Amino acid sequence: MNVKIDGRRKINSNVIVPPDKSISHRSIMIGSLANGVTEIENFLFSDDCLATINCFKNLSTDIEIRNDKIIVKGNGFALSAPKQILDCQNSGTTTRLLLGILSTQEFESILTGDSSLKKRPMKRVTVPLSQMGAEFEFLEKEDFLPIKVKGSKKLKPIEYTLPIPSAQVKSALIFASLKAEGKSVIKESPKSRDHTELMLKHAGANIKSWEKDGVYTVEILPSQISSIKIKIPSDISSAAFFIVLALICEGSSVVIENCILNPTRTGIIDVLKQMGAEIKIEDVENRNGELVGKIVARSSNLRGVKVEKNDIPRIIDEIPILAVAAAFAEGKTIIDHASELRVKESDRIKTTVEMLKSFGAECYELENGLEIIGSREKLKSAVVNSYKDHRIAMAASIMACAVEGESTILDADCVSISFPNFYDILFSSTKKI
Ligand SMILES: O=C(O)C1=C[C@@H](OP(=O)(O)O)[C@@H](O)[C@H](O)C1
Ligand SMILES: C=C(OP(=O)(O)O)C(=O)O
Protein backbone atom coordinates (compact mmCIF):
# COMPACT_ATOMS: atom_id res chain seq x y z
CA MET A 1 0.00 0.00 0.00
CA ASN A 2 1.23 3.48 -0.91
CA VAL A 3 -0.07 6.49 1.04
CA LYS A 4 -0.44 10.00 -0.36
CA ILE A 5 -0.09 12.93 2.04
CA ASP A 6 -1.06 16.47 1.12
CA GLY A 7 1.46 18.61 2.99
CA ARG A 8 1.47 21.82 5.05
CA ARG A 9 -0.72 20.34 7.77
CA LYS A 10 -1.08 21.13 11.44
CA ILE A 11 -2.25 19.34 14.56
CA ASN A 12 -4.14 20.73 17.57
CA SER A 13 -5.45 17.79 19.51
CA ASN A 14 -5.11 14.96 21.99
CA VAL A 15 -3.76 11.80 20.41
CA ILE A 16 -4.36 8.33 21.80
CA VAL A 17 -1.07 6.58 21.08
CA PRO A 18 -1.05 2.75 20.95
CA PRO A 19 0.21 0.61 23.83
CA ASP A 20 3.92 0.05 24.37
CA LYS A 21 5.40 -2.64 22.13
CA SER A 22 8.27 -3.68 24.43
CA ILE A 23 5.94 -4.07 27.42
CA SER A 24 3.30 -5.90 25.33
CA HIS A 25 5.82 -8.58 24.25
CA ARG A 26 7.03 -9.02 27.82
CA SER A 27 3.51 -9.27 29.26
CA ILE A 28 2.80 -12.35 27.09
CA MET A 29 6.20 -13.91 27.82
CA ILE A 30 6.14 -13.34 31.59
CA GLY A 31 2.46 -14.34 31.73
CA SER A 32 3.33 -17.62 29.97
CA LEU A 33 6.13 -18.40 32.44
CA ALA A 34 4.16 -17.39 35.56
CA ASN A 35 2.24 -19.71 37.86
CA GLY A 36 -1.42 -18.76 37.35
CA VAL A 37 -3.55 -16.41 35.32
CA THR A 38 -2.13 -13.08 34.07
CA GLU A 39 -4.56 -10.37 32.95
CA ILE A 40 -3.33 -7.83 30.41
CA GLU A 41 -5.22 -4.61 29.69
CA ASN A 42 -4.43 -2.32 26.75
CA PHE A 43 -2.28 -4.82 24.82
CA LEU A 44 -0.75 -3.71 21.49
CA PHE A 45 -2.42 -5.71 18.72
CA SER A 46 0.31 -5.02 16.16
CA ASP A 47 2.04 -7.53 13.86
CA ASP A 48 5.14 -7.85 16.08
CA CYS A 49 3.15 -8.52 19.25
CA LEU A 50 0.78 -10.91 17.44
CA ALA A 51 3.90 -12.85 16.37
CA THR A 52 4.78 -13.23 20.06
CA ILE A 53 1.25 -14.45 20.89
CA ASN A 54 1.38 -16.99 18.04
CA CYS A 55 4.78 -18.33 19.13
CA PHE A 56 3.55 -18.86 22.70
CA LYS A 57 0.31 -20.48 21.52
CA ASN A 58 2.54 -22.81 19.47
CA LEU A 59 4.39 -23.61 22.73
CA SER A 60 0.97 -24.57 24.22
CA THR A 61 0.34 -21.50 26.40
CA ASP A 62 -3.37 -20.87 26.77
CA ILE A 63 -3.87 -17.26 25.59
CA GLU A 64 -7.38 -15.88 25.24
CA ILE A 65 -8.63 -12.49 24.09
CA ARG A 66 -11.64 -11.64 26.26
CA ASN A 67 -13.42 -8.25 26.08
CA ASP A 68 -10.29 -6.31 25.06
CA LYS A 69 -8.22 -8.02 27.77
CA ILE A 70 -5.75 -10.82 27.24
CA ILE A 71 -5.87 -13.72 29.65
CA VAL A 72 -2.67 -15.79 29.77
CA LYS A 73 -2.75 -19.07 31.70
CA GLY A 74 0.87 -19.60 32.74
CA ASN A 75 2.26 -23.03 33.57
CA GLY A 76 5.38 -22.00 35.50
CA PHE A 77 7.98 -22.51 32.75
CA ALA A 78 6.34 -25.80 31.64
CA LEU A 79 6.11 -25.05 27.90
CA SER A 80 5.57 -27.88 25.38
CA ALA A 81 7.54 -28.68 22.24
CA PRO A 82 6.06 -26.70 19.32
CA LYS A 83 4.28 -28.60 16.57
CA GLN A 84 5.42 -26.07 13.98
CA ILE A 85 8.37 -23.80 13.30
CA LEU A 86 8.15 -20.68 15.49
CA ASP A 87 7.69 -17.76 13.08
CA CYS A 88 8.90 -14.52 14.67
CA GLN A 89 7.96 -12.65 11.45
CA ASN A 90 9.59 -9.17 11.62
CA SER A 91 10.21 -9.02 15.36
CA GLY A 92 13.73 -8.96 16.81
CA THR A 93 12.34 -8.72 20.35
CA THR A 94 10.25 -11.89 19.91
CA THR A 95 13.23 -13.81 18.53
CA ARG A 96 15.94 -12.84 20.97
CA LEU A 97 13.82 -13.02 24.14
CA LEU A 98 12.35 -16.35 23.00
CA LEU A 99 15.87 -17.76 22.49
CA GLY A 100 16.53 -17.00 26.17
CA ILE A 101 13.26 -18.60 27.28
CA LEU A 102 13.72 -21.70 25.10
CA SER A 103 17.19 -22.16 26.61
CA THR A 104 15.36 -23.31 29.78
CA GLN A 105 13.34 -25.97 27.92
CA GLU A 106 14.69 -29.46 27.14
CA PHE A 107 12.84 -29.85 23.83
CA GLU A 108 14.06 -28.76 20.41
CA SER A 109 12.48 -25.84 18.50
CA ILE A 110 13.20 -24.03 15.25
CA LEU A 111 12.81 -20.24 14.97
CA THR A 112 12.52 -18.34 11.72
CA GLY A 113 11.37 -14.93 10.47
CA ASP A 114 10.77 -12.76 7.41
CA SER A 115 13.51 -11.66 5.00
CA SER A 116 14.39 -8.59 7.14
CA LEU A 117 14.63 -10.56 10.41
CA LYS A 118 16.75 -13.22 8.69
CA LYS A 119 19.42 -10.52 8.15
CA ARG A 120 19.64 -9.58 11.85
CA PRO A 121 22.48 -11.01 13.98
CA MET A 122 21.66 -13.65 16.60
CA LYS A 123 25.09 -14.69 17.92
CA ARG A 124 24.86 -11.81 20.40
CA VAL A 125 22.35 -14.01 22.28
CA THR A 126 23.40 -17.53 21.26
CA VAL A 127 27.05 -17.04 22.38
CA PRO A 128 26.29 -16.23 26.04
CA LEU A 129 23.31 -18.64 26.14
CA SER A 130 25.63 -21.43 24.88
CA GLN A 131 27.99 -20.63 27.77
CA MET A 132 25.05 -21.36 30.06
CA GLY A 133 24.55 -24.77 28.41
CA ALA A 134 21.89 -24.24 25.71
CA GLU A 135 22.59 -25.61 22.23
CA PHE A 136 22.06 -23.75 18.95
CA GLU A 137 22.42 -24.64 15.30
CA PHE A 138 22.25 -22.08 12.49
CA LEU A 139 20.35 -23.94 9.78
CA GLU A 140 21.24 -21.75 6.78
CA LYS A 141 23.87 -19.15 7.63
CA GLU A 142 26.04 -18.60 10.71
CA ASP A 143 24.59 -15.86 12.99
CA PHE A 144 21.15 -15.74 11.32
CA LEU A 145 17.70 -17.32 11.39
CA PRO A 146 16.51 -20.02 10.96
CA ILE A 147 17.99 -21.39 14.20
CA LYS A 148 17.45 -24.68 16.00
CA VAL A 149 17.56 -24.38 19.79
CA LYS A 150 17.69 -27.08 22.44
CA GLY A 151 17.65 -25.94 26.05
CA SER A 152 18.54 -27.62 29.31
CA LYS A 153 17.10 -28.00 32.79
CA LYS A 154 20.64 -27.70 34.16
CA LEU A 155 21.73 -24.27 32.89
CA LYS A 156 24.87 -22.83 34.45
CA PRO A 157 24.58 -19.30 35.88
CA ILE A 158 26.47 -16.62 33.96
CA GLU A 159 28.51 -13.50 34.70
CA TYR A 160 28.40 -11.45 31.54
CA THR A 161 29.11 -7.88 30.45
CA LEU A 162 27.26 -6.93 27.28
CA PRO A 163 29.67 -5.66 24.59
CA ILE A 164 26.93 -3.30 23.35
CA PRO A 165 23.98 -2.30 25.57
CA SER A 166 20.87 -4.18 24.42
CA ALA A 167 17.60 -4.81 26.22
CA GLN A 168 16.98 -7.81 23.97
CA VAL A 169 20.27 -9.53 24.86
CA LYS A 170 19.97 -8.59 28.54
CA SER A 171 16.36 -9.87 28.68
CA ALA A 172 17.25 -13.19 26.98
CA LEU A 173 19.97 -13.76 29.60
CA ILE A 174 17.67 -12.76 32.46
CA PHE A 175 15.00 -15.25 31.34
CA ALA A 176 17.56 -18.06 31.09
CA SER A 177 19.06 -17.07 34.48
CA LEU A 178 15.70 -17.50 36.21
CA LYS A 179 16.15 -21.27 35.75
CA ALA A 180 19.96 -21.53 36.12
CA GLU A 181 21.61 -23.35 39.02
CA GLY A 182 22.88 -20.31 40.94
CA LYS A 183 23.32 -16.54 40.85
CA SER A 184 23.84 -14.77 37.48
CA VAL A 185 25.21 -11.26 37.11
CA ILE A 186 24.69 -9.21 33.93
CA LYS A 187 26.29 -5.81 33.34
CA GLU A 188 25.93 -3.14 30.66
CA SER A 189 26.97 0.45 30.17
CA PRO A 190 25.00 2.60 29.67
CA LYS A 191 21.74 1.05 30.79
CA SER A 192 19.22 -0.08 28.15
CA ARG A 193 15.45 -0.27 28.67
CA ASP A 194 14.65 -2.22 31.86
CA HIS A 195 11.03 -3.34 31.38
CA THR A 196 11.95 -7.02 31.82
CA GLU A 197 13.58 -6.35 35.20
CA LEU A 198 10.69 -4.17 36.40
CA MET A 199 7.96 -6.60 35.32
CA LEU A 200 9.78 -9.62 36.77
CA LYS A 201 10.31 -7.80 40.09
CA HIS A 202 6.59 -7.02 40.14
CA ALA A 203 5.92 -10.74 39.51
CA GLY A 204 8.03 -11.67 42.56
CA ALA A 205 11.21 -12.91 40.83
CA ASN A 206 14.44 -12.74 42.79
CA ILE A 207 16.12 -9.92 40.85
CA LYS A 208 18.13 -6.95 42.04
CA SER A 209 19.46 -4.14 39.84
CA TRP A 210 21.50 -1.00 40.44
CA GLU A 211 23.64 1.59 38.69
CA LYS A 212 27.10 2.61 39.93
CA ASP A 213 29.76 4.69 38.17
CA GLY A 214 27.83 4.47 34.89
CA VAL A 215 27.64 0.65 34.99
CA TYR A 216 24.26 -1.02 35.35
CA THR A 217 24.17 -4.44 37.04
CA VAL A 218 21.37 -7.01 37.25
CA GLU A 219 21.67 -9.93 39.69
CA ILE A 220 19.31 -12.86 39.18
CA LEU A 221 18.68 -15.85 41.44
CA PRO A 222 16.64 -18.91 40.37
CA SER A 223 13.01 -17.87 40.77
CA GLN A 224 9.38 -18.73 40.33
CA ILE A 225 7.15 -16.06 38.77
CA SER A 226 3.69 -15.15 40.09
CA SER A 227 0.87 -14.10 37.80
CA ILE A 228 0.18 -10.37 37.60
CA LYS A 229 -2.34 -7.81 36.35
CA ILE A 230 -0.91 -5.35 33.85
CA LYS A 231 -2.32 -2.21 32.25
CA ILE A 232 0.03 -1.24 29.45
CA PRO A 233 0.78 2.49 28.93
CA SER A 234 1.19 4.18 25.54
CA ASP A 235 4.44 3.73 23.63
CA ILE A 236 6.77 6.74 23.70
CA SER A 237 8.44 5.43 20.51
CA SER A 238 5.06 5.84 18.74
CA ALA A 239 4.27 9.10 20.57
CA ALA A 240 7.57 10.52 19.23
CA PHE A 241 6.08 10.81 15.71
CA PHE A 242 3.24 13.05 16.91
CA ILE A 243 5.51 15.05 19.23
CA VAL A 244 7.82 15.89 16.29
CA LEU A 245 4.78 16.60 14.08
CA ALA A 246 3.63 19.27 16.55
CA LEU A 247 7.15 20.71 16.88
CA ILE A 248 7.81 21.15 13.15
CA CYS A 249 4.33 22.19 11.92
CA GLU A 250 3.35 25.82 12.36
CA GLY A 251 0.64 26.66 14.93
CA SER A 252 0.49 23.10 16.29
CA SER A 253 0.15 21.44 19.67
CA VAL A 254 -0.41 17.88 20.81
CA VAL A 255 -1.30 16.18 24.10
CA ILE A 256 -0.46 12.52 24.72
CA GLU A 257 -1.74 11.00 27.95
CA ASN A 258 -0.92 7.76 29.72
CA CYS A 259 2.49 7.50 28.06
CA ILE A 260 5.41 5.40 29.30
CA LEU A 261 8.04 7.73 30.83
CA ASN A 262 10.56 5.16 32.02
CA PRO A 263 13.89 7.10 32.06
CA THR A 264 15.48 4.43 29.80
CA ARG A 265 12.97 5.48 27.12
CA THR A 266 12.76 9.28 27.43
CA GLY A 267 15.96 10.12 25.54
CA ILE A 268 13.86 11.57 22.71
CA ILE A 269 12.25 14.11 25.07
CA ASP A 270 15.64 15.12 26.51
CA VAL A 271 17.32 15.51 23.10
CA LEU A 272 14.37 17.44 21.62
CA LYS A 273 14.41 19.75 24.66
CA GLN A 274 18.16 20.34 24.09
CA MET A 275 17.14 21.36 20.55
CA GLY A 276 14.83 23.98 22.02
CA ALA A 277 11.56 22.05 21.87
CA GLU A 278 8.69 23.24 23.99
CA ILE A 279 7.68 19.97 25.68
CA LYS A 280 6.08 19.60 29.10
CA ILE A 281 5.69 16.43 31.17
CA GLU A 282 2.77 16.39 33.61
CA ASP A 283 0.80 14.11 35.96
CA VAL A 284 3.57 11.52 36.36
CA GLU A 285 2.67 8.41 38.38
CA ASN A 286 4.46 5.18 39.23
CA ARG A 287 2.62 2.09 37.97
CA ASN A 288 4.33 -1.03 39.38
CA GLY A 289 7.77 0.47 38.87
CA GLU A 290 7.05 2.05 35.46
CA LEU A 291 6.60 5.84 35.26
CA VAL A 292 3.58 6.95 33.23
CA GLY A 293 2.36 10.48 32.46
CA LYS A 294 1.23 13.18 30.06
CA ILE A 295 3.32 14.81 27.32
CA VAL A 296 2.41 18.22 25.88
CA ALA A 297 4.34 19.55 22.86
CA ARG A 298 3.92 22.67 20.71
CA SER A 299 5.51 24.19 17.59
CA SER A 300 9.05 25.29 18.35
CA ASN A 301 12.09 26.83 16.72
CA LEU A 302 14.59 23.99 16.86
CA ARG A 303 18.37 24.15 16.69
CA GLY A 304 20.86 21.40 15.81
CA VAL A 305 22.47 19.29 18.50
CA LYS A 306 25.24 16.72 19.02
CA VAL A 307 23.61 13.64 20.56
CA GLU A 308 25.61 12.25 23.50
CA LYS A 309 26.95 8.70 23.16
CA ASN A 310 25.28 7.76 26.48
CA ASP A 311 21.88 8.82 25.14
CA ILE A 312 22.01 6.46 22.13
CA PRO A 313 20.42 3.38 23.83
CA ARG A 314 17.68 5.66 25.25
CA ILE A 315 16.80 6.95 21.79
CA ILE A 316 17.70 4.05 19.52
CA ASP A 317 14.25 3.54 17.92
CA GLU A 318 13.55 7.29 17.68
CA ILE A 319 16.56 8.23 15.54
CA PRO A 320 14.65 8.29 12.20
CA ILE A 321 12.09 10.75 13.61
CA LEU A 322 14.78 12.73 15.46
CA ALA A 323 16.53 13.11 12.09
CA VAL A 324 13.30 14.57 10.66
CA ALA A 325 13.22 17.13 13.50
CA ALA A 326 16.90 17.91 12.76
CA ALA A 327 16.09 18.65 9.10
CA PHE A 328 13.74 21.43 10.32
CA ALA A 329 16.23 22.78 12.90
CA GLU A 330 18.73 25.56 12.46
CA GLY A 331 22.32 24.27 12.21
CA LYS A 332 23.95 20.88 12.30
CA THR A 333 22.85 17.74 14.16
CA ILE A 334 25.31 14.90 14.71
CA ILE A 335 24.19 11.44 15.72
CA ASP A 336 27.19 9.13 16.17
CA HIS A 337 28.00 5.85 18.03
CA ALA A 338 24.79 4.38 16.65
CA SER A 339 26.14 1.38 14.69
CA GLU A 340 23.22 -0.67 16.08
CA LEU A 341 20.99 1.18 13.60
CA ARG A 342 22.61 -0.84 10.81
CA VAL A 343 21.02 -4.08 12.13
CA LYS A 344 17.43 -3.01 12.71
CA GLU A 345 14.47 -3.76 10.36
CA SER A 346 16.50 -1.92 7.72
CA ASP A 347 19.97 -0.34 7.84
CA ARG A 348 18.46 2.73 9.49
CA ILE A 349 21.56 4.89 8.92
CA LYS A 350 21.27 4.36 5.17
CA THR A 351 17.46 4.41 4.99
CA THR A 352 17.08 7.51 7.17
CA VAL A 353 19.64 9.40 5.03
CA GLU A 354 17.90 8.25 1.81
CA MET A 355 14.49 9.26 3.17
CA LEU A 356 15.68 12.75 4.21
CA LYS A 357 17.47 13.27 0.89
CA SER A 358 14.29 12.46 -1.07
CA PHE A 359 12.70 15.48 0.64
CA GLY A 360 15.70 17.64 -0.37
CA ALA A 361 17.38 17.68 3.06
CA GLU A 362 21.13 18.02 3.36
CA CYS A 363 22.41 15.03 5.21
CA TYR A 364 25.34 12.62 5.25
CA GLU A 365 25.97 9.05 6.24
CA LEU A 366 28.72 8.53 8.85
CA GLU A 367 30.27 5.16 9.61
CA ASN A 368 28.23 4.83 12.81
CA GLY A 369 25.60 7.51 12.44
CA LEU A 370 24.46 10.50 10.43
CA GLU A 371 24.84 14.24 10.14
CA ILE A 372 21.98 16.52 9.20
CA ILE A 373 22.23 20.18 8.23
CA GLY A 374 18.94 21.89 8.98
CA SER A 375 17.43 23.36 5.81
CA ARG A 376 13.70 24.01 6.27
CA GLU A 377 13.52 26.29 3.17
CA LYS A 378 14.95 23.61 0.84
CA LEU A 379 12.51 20.86 1.84
CA LYS A 380 9.90 19.77 -0.72
CA SER A 381 7.37 16.99 -1.25
CA ALA A 382 8.65 13.62 -2.44
CA VAL A 383 7.98 10.03 -3.40
CA VAL A 384 9.68 8.15 -0.58
CA ASN A 385 10.78 4.56 -0.17
CA SER A 386 9.94 3.20 3.30
CA TYR A 387 12.18 0.17 2.74
CA LYS A 388 9.29 -1.70 4.44
CA ASP A 389 10.59 -0.39 7.77
CA HIS A 390 7.75 0.89 9.99
CA ARG A 391 9.82 3.60 11.65
CA ILE A 392 11.08 4.95 8.30
CA ALA A 393 7.51 4.95 6.88
CA MET A 394 6.18 6.91 9.87
CA ALA A 395 9.11 9.35 10.01
CA ALA A 396 8.64 10.05 6.26
CA SER A 397 4.90 10.58 6.77
CA ILE A 398 5.53 13.21 9.46
CA MET A 399 8.03 14.97 7.17
CA ALA A 400 5.41 14.85 4.38
CA CYS A 401 2.88 16.59 6.67
CA ALA A 402 5.25 19.51 7.24
CA VAL A 403 6.41 20.23 3.66
CA GLU A 404 4.46 21.92 0.86
CA GLY A 405 2.81 19.68 -1.79
CA GLU A 406 1.78 16.05 -2.12
CA SER A 407 4.14 13.25 -1.05
CA THR A 408 3.79 9.50 -1.53
CA ILE A 409 5.07 6.99 1.01
CA LEU A 410 5.74 3.63 -0.66
CA ASP A 411 4.96 0.34 1.12
CA ALA A 412 3.42 2.24 4.00
CA ASP A 413 1.45 -0.77 5.29
CA CYS A 414 4.52 -1.77 7.35
CA VAL A 415 3.27 0.68 10.04
CA SER A 416 1.20 -2.31 11.28
CA ILE A 417 4.41 -3.67 12.88
CA SER A 418 4.11 -1.22 15.77
CA PHE A 419 1.31 1.31 15.07
CA PRO A 420 -1.57 -0.25 13.07
CA ASN A 421 -3.87 2.81 13.18
CA PHE A 422 -1.10 5.33 12.44
CA TYR A 423 -2.71 6.75 9.26
CA ASP A 424 -6.24 6.89 10.75
CA ILE A 425 -4.86 8.98 13.61
CA LEU A 426 -2.60 11.06 11.35
CA PHE A 427 -5.42 12.05 8.98
CA SER A 428 -8.08 12.55 11.67
CA SER A 429 -5.86 14.64 13.97
CA THR A 430 -4.29 16.94 11.33
CA LYS A 431 -5.68 19.39 8.81
CA LYS A 432 -4.30 21.55 6.01
CA ILE A 433 -3.04 24.93 7.15
O1 LIG B 1 13.90 -5.06 24.19
C1 LIG B 1 13.14 -4.40 23.44
O2 LIG B 1 11.90 -4.39 23.56
C2 LIG B 1 13.78 -3.60 22.38
C3 LIG B 1 15.13 -3.32 22.43
C4 LIG B 1 15.86 -2.54 21.42
O3 LIG B 1 16.67 -3.42 20.65
P1 LIG B 1 18.16 -3.85 21.11
O4 LIG B 1 18.07 -4.64 22.35
O5 LIG B 1 18.68 -4.66 19.94
O6 LIG B 1 18.91 -2.57 21.30
C5 LIG B 1 14.90 -1.79 20.49
O7 LIG B 1 15.59 -1.33 19.36
C6 LIG B 1 13.73 -2.64 20.08
O8 LIG B 1 12.84 -1.91 19.27
C7 LIG B 1 12.94 -3.11 21.27
C1 LIG C 1 13.93 -2.45 16.22
C2 LIG C 1 12.63 -2.60 16.48
O1 LIG C 1 12.02 -3.74 16.93
P1 LIG C 1 12.54 -5.24 16.96
O2 LIG C 1 14.00 -5.23 17.27
O3 LIG C 1 11.72 -5.92 18.02
O4 LIG C 1 12.26 -5.83 15.59
C3 LIG C 1 11.72 -1.42 16.37
O5 LIG C 1 10.55 -1.56 16.73
O6 LIG C 1 12.14 -0.33 15.91
UniProtKB/Swiss-Prot annotation:
Enzyme Commission no: 2.5.1.19
Major site of localization recorded for this protein: cytoplasm
Associated pathway: Metabolic intermediate biosynthesis; chorismate biosynthesis; chorismate from D-erythrose 4-phosphate and phosphoenolpyruvate: step 6/7
Family matches, as Gene3D superfamilies: Enolpyruvate transferase domain
A Pfam family that the UniProt record links to this protein: EPSP_synthase
GO molecular function annotations of the record: 3-phosphoshikimate 1-carboxyvinyltransferase activity
EC main group: transferase
Alphabetically ordered keywords of this record: Amino-acid biosynthesis, Aromatic amino acid biosynthesis, Cytoplasm, Transferase
Keyword Transferase: yes
Chain positions recorded as phosphoenolpyruvate binding sites: 21, 92, 120, 168, 348, 391
Active site, UniProt feature: 317
GO biological process: amino acid biosynthetic process; aromatic amino acid family biosynthetic process; chorismate biosynthetic process
Reaction catalysis annotation: 3-phosphoshikimate + phosphoenolpyruvate = 5-O-(1-carboxyvinyl)-3-phosphoshikimate + phosphate
Statement: the UniProt record of this protein carries the keyword Transit peptide: no
GO CC field: cytoplasm
Record's subcellular location: Cytoplasm
CDD domains referenced in this protein's UniProt entry, alphabetically: EPSP_synthase (cd01556)
Subunit structure: Monomer.
Function: Catalyzes the transfer of the enolpyruvyl moiety of phosphoenolpyruvate (PEP) to the 5-hydroxyl of shikimate-3-phosphate (S3P) to produce enolpyruvyl shikimate-3-phosphate and inorganic phosphate.
PANTHER family found in the cross-reference section: AROM/DEHYDROQUINATE SYNTHASE, PENTAFUNCTIONAL AROM POLYPEPTIDE
Homology family: Belongs to the EPSP synthase family.
Protein name: 3-phosphoshikimate 1-carboxyvinyltransferase
Upper classification of the organism: Bacteria, Bacillati, Bacillota, Bacillota incertae sedis, Caldicellulosiruptorales
